[in-house]
Amino acid sequence: MSDNVSDHKPIVLEHRQVGEAVGDFPPDRRLQLPLTAEERTVLRGRRCSDCGLSLLLQLPREGPLQPGDRLLDRSRSWEVVVIAAPEPLLRVQADSVLELLQAAYHLGNRHVALELHDGELLLLKDSVLEAMLRSRGLRVSACERPFLPEGGAYGGSPSHAHRHSHVHSHSHETP
């Protein structure tokens, strides 16, 4: 691995394998790539492995990366496993299923990426959304962990959250 560090050439990753390992890689040719939910939607550009090696993603546009995906260079001499990096989140809990469903409805109406669990919702930390949820009487606490949001009704990217700048032509009014 010292060659990569000393000459600063990134390992160019062009292939994506889903599922089980594609071969036996020696430990010094097997890396991990921690990425946030947003970073997993960007399939091109420079990244850094967990041990500091420079990587260049040049992957086909086949949808967001998922934890466990294996990325390979052209010669298939490096294997890089995608892992979900911990990130600051809000955990939302309610006294009833209905209250939690209403929270999910209002967040979905705002195109907020959500991770759904029995009895709780997780979303990226956002002070405005936190205040809105608290004003509805929900229990909101901060946590840090990997974020695995739902992919959306149309198979789209889970990152179509609060960070976009385009204008929608439909209303976000709540009943």
UniProtKB/Swiss-Prot annotation:
Disulfide bonds: none annotated. Residues 160-169 have a biased composition (Basic residues). Belongs to the UreE family. Pfam families: UreE_C (PF05194). Involved in urease metallocenter assembly. Binds nickel. Probably functions as a nickel donor during metallocenter assembly. GO terms for biological process: protein folding; protein-containing complex assembly; urea metabolic process. InterPro entries: UreE, UreE_C_dom, UreE_N, UreE_N_sf. It comes from the Bacteria. This is Urease accessory protein UreE.
